[in-house]
C-alpha cells in the first residue's frame, strides 16, 4: 500500500481474499517499506521450468512444487500486473535458464491475463523456448457461493502439480 500511496499515477490495489489469512516476512520496524515498482519476486530458484503466477496462486504453486518434488521449478511472483510494469528482465533471465514456461492463474481460460502474458512471452522469447508456453487456469464457470462449484471454477494445487509433471517430461 505504501508504494501505491507514493505513486503519482492512478493505482488499483488488488487484495485477494485468499491472502487474508496468510503470513509472510516483512522488514521489521520499517513502517514506510515500499515494494520496488515493476519488480517481480523470485520465490523459488530452479532450472527446469519457469512458473509465473500472482496473488494467491503463488502459494499454490510453491505447495505444488514441494508436493511433486521431482521438478526443479523456478517460481516467479509477478506482483505488478499492468503491462507497463511487467518485469521482463526477471522473466527473460529465468526463461533463458529453463527454456520452459508454465503460467498459473485462478481465473478462467478465456480472456485472462495469462493469455496475454503467454502471447507476449512467445513474441519476446521464442528463440529460448524448447516447449510451448503452458497454462493452468480455472474452469469456465465463475466462482460462486457454493464451495463445490467454487472448487470446480478455480485452479488449485492439484492442477498445478499435474501441469508441472506434464511440462517436465515433455
Which functions belong to the PLM regions below?
Residues 1-9:
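Internal gly/pro-rich beta-alpha loop/helix module
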Residues 17-170:
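Thiamine diphosphate
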Amino acid at each position: 500500500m505504501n508504494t501505491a500511496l507514493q505513486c503519482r499515477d492512478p493505482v488499483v490495489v488488488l487484495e485477494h481474499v485468499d491472502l487474508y489469512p496468510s503470513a509472510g516476512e516483512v522488514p521489521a520496524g520499517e513502517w514506510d517499506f515500499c515494494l520496488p515498482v515493476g519488480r517481480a519476486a523470485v520465490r523459488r530458484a530452479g532450472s527446469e521450468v519457469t512458473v509465473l503466477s500472482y496473488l494467491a496462486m503463488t502459494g499454490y504453486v510453491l505447495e505444488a512444487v514441494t508436493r511433486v518434488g521431482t521438478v526443479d521449478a523456478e517460481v516467479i511472483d509477478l506482483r505488478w500486473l499492468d503491462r507497463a510494469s511487467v518485469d521482463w528482465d526477471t522473466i527473460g533471465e529465468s526463461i533463458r535458464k529453463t527454456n520452459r514456461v508454465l503460467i498459473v492463474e485462478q481465473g478462467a481460460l478465456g480472456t485472462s491475463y495469462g493469455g496475454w502474458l503467454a502471447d507476449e512471452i512467445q513474441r519476446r522469447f521464442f528463440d529460448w523456448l524448447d516447449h510451448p508456453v503452458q497454462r493452468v487456469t480455472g474452469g469456465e464457470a465463475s466462482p460462486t457461493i457454493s464451495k463445490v462449484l467454487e472448487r470446480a471454477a478455480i485452479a488449485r494445487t492439484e492442477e498445478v502439480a499435474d501441469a508441472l509433471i506434464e511440462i517436465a517430461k515433455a
